[in-house]
Amino acid sequence: PAQRDEVVQFLGDRATVQESGWLCNILVVPNNQRKPFDDFRVRRALTLAIDRWGGSRALSQITFMGPVGGVMRPGGPFATPEAELTKLAGFGRDINAARQEARRLLREAGVPEGFEFTVKNRNIPMPYIPAGIFLVDQWRQVGLNPRHVIQETGPYLADLRAGNYDVGIDFTCDFFDDPDVQLVKFVSSDRNPLNYARYTDRLLDGLFRQQSRERDLQRRLQIVRQFERRVLSDRAYQYHLLWWQRIVPHWKKLQGYRVGPSHYLEDLEEVWLSE
């Protein structure tokens, strides 16, 4: 946002800005094979502690993170309506009640006050490091003591792939609004090695196949919602922090350009220069 404002201020009426939802997001990835994160109560407590709605307001002022959403892009054709989204663990608007529940789950799971764990993150200033700082603060609100470990991309990815982490900050960036593309990240790790959360869930794998083969749109949406509830809430395997927002400043003489949700597939068919 600040860079957008600088461009507009410098170029004045010679520039214009287009914004759009983005098929990218930040994911919180607990290591489902490492104690105590092998206990779904602990994983659920971590997501309950995150104030996504407050974080959206704050982080959208300093980063391109912003929209709150589930497994499908907010604003997209398969997006979960807010009334349904807020029923998922960690996506409700009453953060005080959510954190009270998070503390209860941690106590029930035997996690002591001040429990220390590492949060491994990518050494990229935007948006990974602000996301990590925010998450560390959120988890401290429920009595945990996370340590933010920032790594170069090579060691960071090697640790995620090897399971050498407690909690990781991951991401997805896709090219098309379709459940076949967005949901594959969450099928069992032995079916998709890009699922770093290290779990096996044949029910999820079956739901993925079902929705992919379903021709009726409404029935497909129902299966996608069932998949989403299991991943993000019922089992809390891994979950989104926030989705990203595309901000594209360009010269006004660039005509016919329409910003879309993917930076991989731009629609340039009708682009032309007015001078």
Question: Which residue ranges define each predicted feature?
Answer:
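Ligand-site clamp/hinge motif
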Residues: 1-6, 10, 44, 133-136, ...
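Extracellular/periplasmic solute-recognition and catalytic clefts
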Residues: 1-34, 57-58, 171
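Ligand-binding "clamshell"
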Residues: 3-18, 162-165, 178-193, 251-257
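Extracytoplasmic/peripheral linker and loop segments enriched in polar/acidic and small residues
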Residues: 41, 69, 89-96, 145-156, ...
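Short, well-ordered beta-strand elements
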Residues: 114-124, 147-149
